[in-house]
């Protein structure tokens, strides 16, 4: 199995409507932008929606995940859909949102979530700055 650090720098090839697209794992700024969009798109209720267990809210979270990732990492998809600059993907109709969400869940989410899990594990394995009685910065 490849080292996850190497996987983070590799280009993933995905296909949307017959067009192959290259995507790299988000850098720190992009990761934060994705998470900020999730918060904005959910009106600050992303965690509540995710934890609710309500089918419609779980679907809404899936839509939010898809749109947030596409907005930040796959601007080519926006261009293919002729979404005007400055307009959010959240303004697309429900049929297109469903298509984008299904595509994201099939081609992006397994890869992205797997690498995020590996980052969490690696981060949790590292000692805190204060574990050894070090001074606060």
Located regions from the model:
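Short, surface-exposed, charged amphipathic helix/loop patches that serve as local interaction elements
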Residues: 6-13, 19-137
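Short, basic/low-complexity N-terminal boundary segments at the transition from targeting/disordered tails
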Residues: 1-5
């Amino acid at each position: 199995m490849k080292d996850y650090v190497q996987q983070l720098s590799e280009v993933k090839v995905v296909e949307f409507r017959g067009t192959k697209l290259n995507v790299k794992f988000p850098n720190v700024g992009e990761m934060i932008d994705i998470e900020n969009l999730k918060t904005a798109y959910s009106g600050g209720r992303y965690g509540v929606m995710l934890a609710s267990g309500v089918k419609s809210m779980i679907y809404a979270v899936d839509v939010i995940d898809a749109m947030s990732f596409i907005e930040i990492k796959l601007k080519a998809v926006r261009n293919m859909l002729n979404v005007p600059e400055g307009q959010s993907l959240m303004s697309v109709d429900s049929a297109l949102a469903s298509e984008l969400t299904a595509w994201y869940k099939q081609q992006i989410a397994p890869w992205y979530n797997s690498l995020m899990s590996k980052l969490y594990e690696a981060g949790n394995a590292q000692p805190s700055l204060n574990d050894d009685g070090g001074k606060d910065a």
